[in-house]
Amino acid sequence: METTKVVCNKEFQIDRVDSRLFGSFLEHMGRVIYSGIYEPDNKNADEDGFRQDVIDRVKEMNVTTVRYPGGNFVSAYHWEDGVGAKEKRPHKLDLAWRSIETNEFGTNEFMKWAKKTNVNPIFTVNLGTRGVEDAAHYLEYCNFSSGTQYSDMRKSHGVDEPYGIKMWCLGNEMDGSWQIGHKSAEEYGKIAAETGKVMKLIDPDIELIVCGSSLSSMDTYPEWDMEVLDKTYDVADYLALHQYYAGQEKGTKTFLAQSVDMEEYIHTIRSVAQVIKQKKRSKKDMKFSVDEWGVWAVPSNTVNNEIDEKPWQIAPAISEQIYTLEDALLFAEMQMVIIRNADAIKIACQSLLTNISACIMTEKGGGHWFCLLYTSDAADDSLRV
């Protein structure tokens, strides 16, 4: 009979586990926002229209960080549409998910919700249809004190003090052909470097996250990541990694073994970053933000069919799934991979928080279902075993 020996010792320390590894993600997609966390007419809504039952669950999970507002959604998003008087906010076409965006929930609503849930925000700027100037204006609105056009705009919206948002993603999945404003690595690297440079002129204390590959299966991986890092290494603080797994129909063994692929993905991308570090003779080690990860069982063609069947609706139910025990096991394996690489990965966002590949499933006009798949109540150190 074969036996396995596991040796644990507190001296086998990899690194401290950053609390930001236990984050999540909110995108204007399907019912993630509307009836997910925000539903003024729901019996569970508080005075601001936020679902108190969901707030309680987020606190129970001890979610530390939440990324917003996307996701594919952000690549055509105008942040100005989601601030100011709600009755004056425009309804817009959401081109990413072919729905109608009411803009009833925007920057200031999210920040109010973040305060109630005790989470640190990560904001994403639009580098699909917009660029350097827009990102600078958004940062000025959020973080500059007063006396300028956009800081005074924020104050006129009832937010006197700047938010001081520290973590910013420079676009989303720009390597993907599905992305609005899709760019080559060279094109994206240039605009990300310039955007980051300008944003750090406004607020030198912010941390910037540049787009890596959308998945390890992308044809351009890891060449994309290498070229982007080559152009942004001096201004970037993190490289974003995204990874989802499905394939339950292939059987339990094959399905659960996918965490090995994730481990190899991270080891490869760490090596890529080291190559660029040596090329630039830099003293800085690039860190990583796995700001979209999870088990997503709904096939992409099914999601597309759902959208085709009900296009241009407000917050339609799309890509909703209920986790199984098998899903939870792979979910746990993926989280262990992240923790084992705690010396390099400092941010991680389980995707998504509500209703799509989520731990919290809500009923519009009703209650919710909750699966406590993870919590930030973890040990301080990551250890080799």
State the predicted function of each range:
Residues 119, 206, 286, 345-346:
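A structural micro-motif
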Residues 327, 331-356:
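Substrate-binding cleft of secreted/luminal carbohydrate-active enzymes
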